[in-house]
C-alpha cells in the first residue's frame, strides 16, 4: 500500500471552502477509483490555514491511474484553487 501526504497551505479565509470541496467533490471522486484505500483531510488544531491531505491506494500504479483520469483533472484544480501552495511526499506503508 502507498500513502501520499500533501501539506496544503490554504489561501487566507479559504479553509472552509477547501474543507467543503474535499467533502463534496474530491473525496467522492477519489473513493470511486480502483485500488483506492482511504483519504482524509487533516487540520492541525493550532494552525487555521494548514492542512494535510492523505490519500492511500493499494499500489502506486493505481494512484497514477487515478492521476491520469479526466475526473482527476476536473477535481484536483478545485482543491488547488483554495491553496496558496502545497508540498507532496509519497510513502510505502509497511
Question: Model segments located where?
Answer:
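Short, flexible segments with low predicted structural confidence
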Residues: 1-3, 18, 34-36
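Short, well-ordered beta-strand segments in beta-rich or mixed alpha/beta enzyme
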Residues: 2-9, 40-67, 92
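Short, surface-exposed ligand-recognition loops at beta-strand->loop->(often short) alpha-helix junctions
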Residues: 9-22
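Noncatalytic linker/hinge segments flanking ATPase motor cores
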Residues: 20, 44-50, 78-85, 93-94
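An amphipathic, aromatic/His-enriched active-site/gating alpha helix that lines ligand/cofactor pockets
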Residues: 24-37, 56-90
